[in-house]
Amino acid sequence: VPAVGRVWPVGVRPGVLRGWDPPATVYGPGHRGVDLSAPPGAQVRAVAAGRVFFAGPVAGRGVVSIELSGTGEPPLRTTYEPVRASVKQGDEVTAGAVVGTVEATGRHCEGPCIHWGLLRGKTYLNPLLLLPPWLLNGPTRLLPVLGVPLP
């Protein structure tokens, strides 16, 4: 998976409430994405540039799905739910573009969250792999060098 992500879907560095847990079989139990802490009404952003593949309700929850540009065939596709979409199918989006807001539903997480998924074709992948280390791990922190002798 290429690290094409340029922003987190919500916030600056949201808490991961539930991580990636791939199922052993296609229909087996598991977690096909990650749940990120996000309050209702928070802006949801495209992590990378692409085209809106789908925006609308699925099983009573709003979903936005984006095909990511330049990620091969079939292209990588991110999904975000529950989201009140501000985009429509076919819209081109840039990395960081607002695609909707987090809806208030309590059916997936114990607290307010957004489920972020990643697929290539019908295969689910870990969406955190889209984020380069500098974004995934947070900013670099310089430490003082007091007491360190100069060369």
What are these regions (language model features)?
Residues 47-84:
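Zn2+-dependent peptidoglycan hydrolase active-site motif and core
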Residues 19, 55-56, 102-105:
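Residue-level recognition of beta-strand microenvironments
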Residues 15-47:
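Short glycine/threonine/proline-enriched tight-turn/helix- or strand-capping micro-motif at secondary-structure
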Residues 43-52, 86-102:
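Short, well-structured beta-strand-loop connectors
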Residues 28, 34-37, 63-70, 117:
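Short, acidic/hydrophobic/Gly-rich beta-strand patch recurrent on exposed beta strands
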Residues 12, 30-32, 40, 48, ...:
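Envelope-exposed proteins and targeting segments
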